[in-house]
Amino acid sequence: MDILQRLMAQLLSSGSSVFVMLSAIVGVMISVAYLVYMERKVIAFMQLRHGPSVVGPFGLLQPFADALKLVTKESIVPLQSRNFAFFIAPVITFTLALSGWAVIPLGASTYVINGVETTIPASIANINLGVLYIFAISSLEVYGIIMAGWSSGSKYAFLGAIRSASQMISYEVSMGLVVLSVAVSAGSLRLVDIVVMRHTMPYWVDLLLLPMAFVFFISILAETNRHPFDLPEAESELVSGYNVEYSSMPFAMFFLGEYANMILVSAMMTIFFLGGWYPPIDVQFLYLIPGFVWFCLKVLLLLFCFIWVRATIPRYRYDQLMRLGWKVFLPFSFVWVMVVSGVLLYLDKLPK
């Protein structure tokens, strides 16, 4: 019995990173599966339809039926494709979509170590440059999409890949400036420090960063190629976009990567602007609810906003999309970073 306890302790210790990473991957995959179910159900409700309702009670087993269908389908390779790049592109996209979750803190516990209060996050890795890590991962995702469009040997796929790359790069600039203003107000690039510092700051700082939160939400819609900025996948123009020649599991990897990115950017916005795992209002009995539950509820709220936007707002033209990014969001974000820094410096509220 003592040996079994020691084995379990070793399995759950920090050294058993493989177990932790596999648990995180399985959790993200299940979340993605039921995000698709949630999207279909919510849009069906808004359009006065039933949505998935046949496979299992209330259609709850529909994601597993869809997964089984994709696994058993034949993978068709176009004659003009470049085989190695064609198959490695979805793997790159899928892997990078999962890699960003390594630094996301789903909660935290506070301990007193050697007389110093220390907050330990519930994340796989707690690195000092967590914000930069996430932005590096999101920037690399462009390569998988470009490889998919180029290697497919299809003009539709190539045009969709070019659109996606230019769109993602354009809005990453605005997102970087938004996160810079958050980092200035928190005084750190560690995600757990950002949540803790933002929680202890006065409410007027949240109001000061509210315009940046709006810019960030619109930017993550464009960054994840979601409606109304889903120009790379515009069915009426490009059939399906950069993944038009993919089927079976390669297509599923692109699909899973897109929805995993949706959850990831929603988690990022929760950390930067919604207080992370803390309750929305500072009332004592709300702290009885675990921080992980608050974090998940806030992420679900943002995912509902993603779905709501898809069901209600028409698609932008490509020139409107680029004009919004370069002529509106970029100058506004740059000016507002200066405003936030100036106000905090003038009122002596910059973190020491």
Curated annotation (Swiss-Prot):
Catalytic activity field: a quinone + NADH + 5 H(+)(in) = a quinol + NAD(+) + 4 H(+)(out)
E.C. number: 7.1.1.-
Name the record gives this protein: NADH-quinone oxidoreductase subunit H
Keyword Transmembrane helix: yes
Role this protein plays: NDH-1 shuttles electrons from NADH, via FMN and iron-sulfur (Fe-S) centers, to quinones in the respiratory chain. The immediate electron acceptor for the enzyme in this species is believed to be ubiquinone. Couples the redox reaction to proton translocation (for every two electrons transferred, four hydrogen ions are translocated across the cytoplasmic membrane), and thus conserves the redox energy in a proton gradient. This subunit may bind ubiquinone.
Assembly mode: NDH-1 is composed of 14 different subunits. Subunits NuoA, H, J, K, L, M, N constitute the membrane sector of the complex.
Subcellular localization, as worded in the UniProt entry: Cell inner membrane
Source taxonomy: Bacteria, Pseudomonadati, Pseudomonadota, Alphaproteobacteria, Rickettsiales
GO MF annotations in UniProt: NADH dehydrogenase activity; oxidoreductase activity, acting on NAD(P)H, quinone or similar compound as acceptor; quinone binding
Domain of life: Bacteria
One GO cellular component, as annotated: plasma membrane
InterPro entries attached to this UniProt entry: NADH_UbQ_OxRdtase_su1/FPO, NADH_UbQ_OxRdtase_su1_CS
Transmembrane segments: 18-38, 84-104, 129-149, 177-197, 201-221, 254-274, 289-309, 328-348
PANTHER family: NADH DEHYDROGENASE SUBUNIT 1, NADH-UBIQUINONE OXIDOREDUCTASE CHAIN 1
Name of the gene: nuoH
Top EC category: translocase
Record NCBIfam families: PRK06076.1-2 (NF004741), PRK06076.1-6 (NF004745)
